[in-house]
Curated annotation (Swiss-Prot):
Gene (name only): swt1
Gene Ontology cellular-component annotations: cytosol; nucleus
Listed name of the protein: Transcriptional protein swt1
InterPro entries registered for this protein in UniProt: PIN-like_dom_sf (IPR029060), PIN_dom (IPR002716), SWT1_Regulator (IPR052626)
Family to which the UniProt record says this protein belongs: Belongs to the SWT1 family.
Compartment(s) of residence: Cytoplasm; Nucleus
Source organism (scientific name): Schizosaccharomyces pombe (strain 972 / ATCC 24843) (Fission yeast)
GO molecular function, one term: RNA endonuclease activity
Function: Involved in transcription.
Amino acid sequence: MDRMEIDDQAGIDFVTESINSERARNRWSTSHIPSLSEINPSSFQSPSPSPFASSTSLASKPARYSKPLGLFVLDTNFLLSHLSLCQNLIEFLTARCPRLVVVLPWTVLQELDGLKSESSSTCGYLARQAHNFLLQCFRSNVSSLRGQKVHEHCSSTEKGDDAILDCCIYYQEEKLIPAVLLSDDKNLSIKAAVHHIQSLSFSKGLEAASIVQTSFPSAFSSNSENLENLSMDIDLTVSQPLATATNHRNQGASTVDIPMDRTHDNSIWASRYAHFPPYDKKKDTTRSAADYIPYTYTALTKEEILHASHPRACKLLDQITKIMVEETAFLLSRHLLKLWGDYDLAMTKLLASPQFPPQNINDVGHELYIHWYTCFDGYLPAQERSNLKSKAELWNEWMLWAERGIGIGPKNQEELQTYVTFWSNIWTLLSRREILGDQASTYIGFREQNIEKWVERSGRERILS
């Protein structure tokens, strides 16, 4: 199909200025439109053959998860003006550099949706052209293209080019994945440079290979990595947390471990698989930091996992539970410290609940339900709060099934992966850079290392056997 391509500076400036003008009018500020990365590709009627149909099934073979080495973040003006170059870049990454990914910011998806309805304008035609191409890509499950999800941001209030910049900052600072902005907007490129985000604009002769070579030269030496040789190991390796709650009364002179409530049943079985107790405010107790001892979730031993009913799932579920139990206590203390500004007051609020610090996944669900708006307001829709306890209960049932063969497990691998993603997102939002302060870089590295393991393992064959 013939495409309109814009490669002269006057045309590029026209597209960029047109989009900036519409952004200034706030025309496409509506939020929560469906992300292309979350739409079921089978629901589309392809308007024309996929541009990847002849690419020897490059996109049809699902790759095992591996954290990207880098991202290219597309601005709307770059996508509209240079669609063929964007297609070449995606094809190049799919074939040669599978650990580099092109990301469509949420705002770009919104702007495409708004622009494509403008039948009489040049930008409208370019938007429809780009929209059809993207639908074909997602229909083909192209692994080197994804959309920014609604929760993947540092600030929920940014709009227009600031939202695109926020997308770059989120991936580079919160996910520790280097991001390169592809944009013809000089002002946005300057903003990106201020935040140490690399940017590239179109120039005559620019090709996909040169974009990658300039941005990520090491990708060429690592693109031969064979991700298919990852094997299922029944080890108990879990990356250890590198951050603890700072005692602000002593200005960082010591650290405070979030302790176990002595009134809980201390047996491993009781704490690991406890159900939600009826919540009774009369049972709330006033406790202070001096009354606590550290609580550490007791993970299953290697021998226990090997003798479990479903060892692969058992290992994964237990490791995720250990992280969520231990890290939720620490992170909630940081959120409330930020809210109240006083360590003792924050701890008093947390410890009013008998389920704090949590000892099992249901305690985690209970505490996050209580403090939902403190932690997630503006990041997750409020209706997610009502599902939190049921998700924790179901996870708890899966743990019993995996270890003892009691009850039912996940319906299929897709359901397991959905829940792994859920807890990964909860942890990511709990441990935002602004909450962690000086410990952010170290802690985020620890978090991303673990999440990468979870997602990769949940996608392995025979995980539920």
